[in-house]
């Protein structure tokens, strides 16, 4: 394993509730009579990208109006307001990194293992989350960062992962991806990257066929995984465990 690639929303932090709240705050601010609850948002998450999600919903509830000439302008405006609300929520605290994330980032830095990000979230959302947890110089911790501005086609297409591989200068089999959703898993696997999945409540019912492992989270000494996982010396995933799982995948593939 020569690099570790992280998704962001749902993987680094359980962000989807904050995104949902931000969408609803934006709807209220612009006077839209929309309100998304958790079950609806779970379904909408099958559509990657906030603007794409807004367009998909608009076509669901009012297909005629969704063909209007100012739809794109409206979606851009609503999404910008939603992004502001999300950043405010992240900046206020209360949105911790998931178990194991901060520890693994630190371990990788100490070991000289390159880290990368492959996400369909916006640069603004990405910066808000990681600056809050890793500081203003967070980008220096990652060898490659690809987000919604990198590729036009979003997950489950593999484009963002292929872009990361190109920037890293590595083959797919040299890397390990950490994802939380079915869309993310399909994107990583379509790029040929072995993938560990840590679902959230919003993605728990997705299909994870093809995943190397599906874990509740990556664990920490203070918050271990519920049970021991073969290949891990502890009830948390350290770099040694990730390397063992990755190595097992390569052995099976030969």
Curated annotation (Swiss-Prot):
Entry keyword set: Plasmid
Entry keyword Ribonucleoprotein: no
Keyword Glycoprotein: no
Pfam families: Hydrolase (PF00702)
Gene Ontology MF terms in the entry: hydrolase activity
NCBIfam families per the UniProt record, alphabetical: HAD-SF-IA-v3
Family the entry assigns: Belongs to the HAD-like hydrolase superfamily. CbbY/CbbZ/Gph/YieH family.
Annotated protein name in UniProt: Protein CbbY, plasmid
